[in-house]
C-alpha cells in the first residue's frame, strides 16, 4: 500500500545573519522568525510525512507552546517523524521539496540539503529531490518578507 502526503510552511524574516533550510545553515542578511530554527523546508516535509500517515501535522506533535522545542534543530523533528512513521510499518519511498524564495539564491546548497534529507530519512539520495524557485517579485516571498516551502512524500507499507 502507498500513501501520499503534502505539506506547506512559511516563515517571515527577522533580524539575523543566516537561515536554515533542510538543515543547511545559509549565510543571509536576515533570519527566520520562529519558535524552532524556522526551517520551512523541513517543516513542510514533516507535514507531508505526517499527512501521508494520517498523523495530523507538525504543530500537533511539536507545539510551539512547548518550551522543549524552543530553538530546536528541525532535523531532530524530522528524524522523530520518520521514527513515528516506521513504527506504523511505513518506509519513505521518495520526497520532493520546493523552496519558494526571492533571495538568497539556493543552487549552491541543494546537494547538501538532499544529503541531509537522505540521511535523516534513511533513504537513498536518488529518492530525494529539493528545488528552489522564485515568485518573480510577487507575493510575500517576492517582496522579501519571508520564505515558503512545499513538500510531497510517498510512503510504502513495509
UniProtKB/Swiss-Prot annotation:
Cofactor: how and how many bound: Binds 1 divalent metal cation per subunit.
Keyword Lyase recorded: yes
Disulfide bonds: none
Pathway annotation from the record: Isoprenoid biosynthesis; isopentenyl diphosphate biosynthesis via DXP pathway; isopentenyl diphosphate from 1-deoxy-D-xylulose 5-phosphate: step 4/6
SUPFAM superfamilies assigned to the protein according to its UniProt record, in alphabetical order: IpsF-like
Residues annotated for 4-CDP-2-C-methyl-D-erythritol 2-phosphate binding in this entry: 9-11, 35-36, 57-59, 62-66, 133-136, 140, 143
Catalytic activity: 4-CDP-2-C-methyl-D-erythritol 2-phosphate = 2-C-methyl-D-erythritol 2,4-cyclic diphosphate + CMP
A biological process from GO: isopentenyl diphosphate biosynthetic process, methylerythritol 4-phosphate pathway
Binding site for a divalent metal cation: 9, 11, 43
Keywords, in A-Z order: Isoprene biosynthesis, Lyase, Metal-binding
Site (Transition state stabilizer): 35, 134
Keyword DNA-binding: no
CDD domains: MECDP_synthase
PANTHER family, A to Z: 2-C-METHYL-D-ERYTHRITOL 2,4-CYCLODIPHOSPHATE SYNTHASE, CHLOROPLASTIC
Binding partners and assembly: Homotrimer.
Listed name of the protein: 2-C-methyl-D-erythritol 2,4-cyclodiphosphate synthase
Gene label: ispF
